[in-house]
Amino acid sequence: MGKKSRVKTQKSGTGATATVSPKEILNLTSELLQKCSSPAPGPGKEWEEYVQIRTLVEKIRKKQKGLSVTFDGKREDYFPDLMKWASENGASVEGFEMVNFKEEGFGLRATRDIKAEELFLWVPRKLLMTVESAKNSVLGPLYSQDRILQAMGNIALAFHLLCERANPNSFWQPYIQTLPSEYDTPLYFEEDEVRYLQSTQAIHDVFSQYKNTARQYAYFYKVIQTHPHANKLPLKDSFTYEDYRWAVSSVMTRQNQIPTEDGSRVTLALIPLWDMCNHTNGLITTGYNLEDDRCECVALQDFRAGEQIYIFYGTRSNAEFVIHSGFFFDNNSHDRVKIKLGVSKSDRLYAMKAEVLARAGIPTSSVFALHFTEPPISAQLLAFLRVFCMTEEELKEHLLGDSAIDRIFTLGNSEFPVSWDNEVKLWTFLEDRASLLLKTYKTTIEEDKSVLKNQDLSVRAKMAIKLRLGEKEILEKAVKSAAVNREFYRQQMEEKAPLPKYEEGNLGLLESSVGDSRLPLVLRNLEEEAGVQDALNIREAISKAQATENGLVNGENSVPNGTRSENENLNQEESKRAVEDAKGSSSDNTAEVKE
C-alpha cells in the first residue's frame, strides 16, 4: 500500500553471516529498555532523547548485521506464486494484475473494464493472517502467557508474521515473499531525513513511534531469550531489531480490522492481494461479508483496462500517511494539522467554562485539528473556541435558564453565534494561534518549495519536506480564513446586526450545516488517530479499540481502510502491571492556553 521499495534481497532460511553473543545484545537491549522507559523529556529535549535512543539502536543493528532471516530475489519474482496461491484458496484473481507504477510503487492494474461499484476483489478468511491465526500458530504458547501480545493485536500480528516468514513451509509464504523488504516509514529514515521534520507538528508522533518501537523490541528480546514458551519459536536464535522494524512496518502499513467469525467483535488482519491497492480520494468501498466469510471490495469508480485500480484508505492526514503508511499523498482533501488547546486552570472563569464544555461533551484540553478544506475548523473546535472566549454573562446564559440546553446544542453550529463579540474574539484567537505556530518553523513556504526542486533529495527527505510544507500551507490558510471571519463578524457587530436565534423550526437549518462536522471532530490524543502506533503504542494495550476509522464504514460488517488496536477487554490495572517493563510514560498532555 503506498509507495513500496525493495532495497535488500532476502531468502527464507538463510543463515547468519556474523556471530554475536546473545548476552551482549541482552545487555544492550536492557540499556535501551531503560532509556526508553524513562520519563518524557522536558520541552526542547525530545530531539536529544531521540538521538540517544537512535545511537543505541544503531549500535544494536551494527552488531546484528547479517543475522536476519532473508529472502532471495525481488518481491515481484513471487507475484505469480501469490496469484496461484490466492486462486487455489478461493480469492478472485481475474480482471487485474500487479504492476510497478514507479512513483506509487506496486499496485493493481485493470486488465478489463471495471464498472463503479462492481465487486472485483474478494479474499476469504483462510488467506488472511489474523490475531486468531496467530493464537493457533507456533506463537500460541507464548501468546497465552504474555499480556502484551494478548492486549495488543498489532504486536501479536507482527510476531506472527516474523514466525511465518522464518518457516519455509508456512501456508502464508506466497504472500510474505511479496511484501516489501523495507519501507518508507520514519522508522527507516536516516537522522538527517528526520531532521527535516524538526519544528513540525508531526515530529512528536515520529519521536513517539521510534521510541515505542525501540522499547517494544528491547522488551521482547528479553522475553524471547528467557521465557520458557519462547523456546520453540524460530526467532529464538535470531530476533534482530531489523526483523522487528520490518514486521512492525508491514503491520503498520497493512493491518485492517475485520469481524471475528461469529461477528461478535473485531480483530486485526493482513489481507493479501487487497493490500496491493494504492490510495486515492473517495469513499471506503471495502467490506466484510460474514455470510461468505470473506473480505470484499467494489470499484471506487469506473476503471478502464490498463488503468490503476485505487481504493480509499480513509480520512487520514498526510502526517498519518507518512508516519504510518510511508507515503505522502498530494492533493489530500482530508489533510489537517493538529492543534493542542486547553483552558488554563488559572483562568478566573475556568470552573464555568469547564462545566459548559462538559455539558457539550468536550474536554477542557484536547488535540483538535485545522483542516485543509473550508471551514478550517470542526464543529467541536468551534464549540470549544466559543466557550473559551465567553464572558461571565455568556457562560451563565449557557448554564442557567430554560434556553441553556438549546444554547449548548448550537455551540458547534456556525449559523448561531453566541454573540458578535464572541465570534470576533474566537477568530482573532485562532488567527493569532495559527500565526504563532507558523513562526515556530525554521523555514518558510517559499524556502521549502525551493528545496523540493533539488533533484538529489532522497524519497524520504522529499516526503518530510512536503509534510512540513503542507502543515505551513494549512496554517497559512487558517490565518487567512480566520482574518476574513474576524472582519465579517466585526462588521456585524459595528452594524449591530440582529443575532440569529435558535428555535425548533430551525432544525432543518441545523441539519443542513454538515460542513462544520464532516471531518473528525477531535483528535483526542496524539496517537489515537494515527493508525498504528495506533498500532504499536504500549499505552493502547489498555485502551478501548474503535471498530472503525473516522466513522466511515461500508456496511454493517465493514472493513475500514485503516485500523486501531484490537480490544481484548483487559482489566486496566492487571494490564498495567503486566506491561510495566514495556510501556512508556504518557507524553500527550496538552498545553494549556491562557486567554
From Swiss-Prot:
GO terms for biological process: actin modification; peptidyl-histidine methylation; positive regulation of DNA-templated transcription; positive regulation of muscle cell differentiation; positive regulation of transcription by RNA polymerase II; regulation of uterine smooth muscle contraction. Pfam families: Rubis-subs-bind, SET. Its main location: cytoplasm. Residues 1-22, 549-595 are annotated as: Disordered. Transmembrane segments: none annotated. The keyword Oxidoreductase does not apply. It catalyses: L-histidyl-[protein] + S-adenosyl-L-methionine = N(tele)-methyl-L-histidyl-[protein] + S-adenosyl-L-homocysteine + H(+). It is an enzyme of class 2 (transferase). The modification Phosphoserine is found at S513. It is found in: Cytoplasm; Nucleus. It comes from the Eukaryota. InterPro entries: Rubisco_LSMT_subst-bd, Rubisco_LSMT_subst-bd_sf, SET_dom, SET_dom_sf, SETD3, SETD3_SET, SETD3_SETD6_MTase. Keywords: Actin-binding, Cytoplasm, Methyltransferase, Nucleus, Phosphoprotein, S-adenosyl-L-methionine, Transferase, Ubl conjugation. Residues 94-314 form the SET domain. Interacts with MYOD1. Belongs to the class V-like SAM-binding methyltransferase superfamily. SETD3 actin-histidine methyltransferase family. This is Actin-histidine N-methyltransferase.
